Amino acid sequence: MQKSRMIYEDVNALIEQEGTRDPHDILISRKVTVLPFRMDTNILGMYTDVVGKKFVFYNRRLDETMKRMVLAHELGHNFYHYDYADLSTAESMSKKSNEELEANIFAAHLLIKTEDILSLYEEGYDINEIASFLYVRPELCNIKLSELQKMGYKIAGNFSIQSDFFKNIKGMDEENWDSEFVHEDPDFFDF
């Protein structure tokens, strides 16, 4: 089966099974502990396994849109990459890049309903407008549309795919923060 179709079908089966698209609820249902990082960091999120116990950590300052995307991405790692957290730096970067792309495809299918993105795209909205309407980043819209094309949907256009776009988003950039953190004293940490 084509990888694009497999991920799409896996996500839809998961949504059907869980009765939700909410990545936080699904992670909890899958017995993954979801916690914010205790300190400020540029890292958006991380999936790890510690002695058989699965964790997702996320940047505590993220706004809800970004947090949802990060949790959906980390859920993709939980679903497909059980050994992801164990990859050593000596391993191939292409394997890591491929796993990042799979997690992004998973997140795009989880957070974006096919009928919603197709309807908005056919109405003539551009990627940035669609992303705004759907509360995701444009990169996820590009991934979703590209994957739908690969599955045979007739969609005009070329969609640039960045497998590592999350890596380029810094958790310490205020534009990604929840408004409660924007004017906080940067020297204050609530542990």
Where in this protein do the model-derived segments appear?
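Active-site hotspot residues in diverse enzymes, especially metal/ion-binding acidic/histidine motifs
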Residues: 1-191
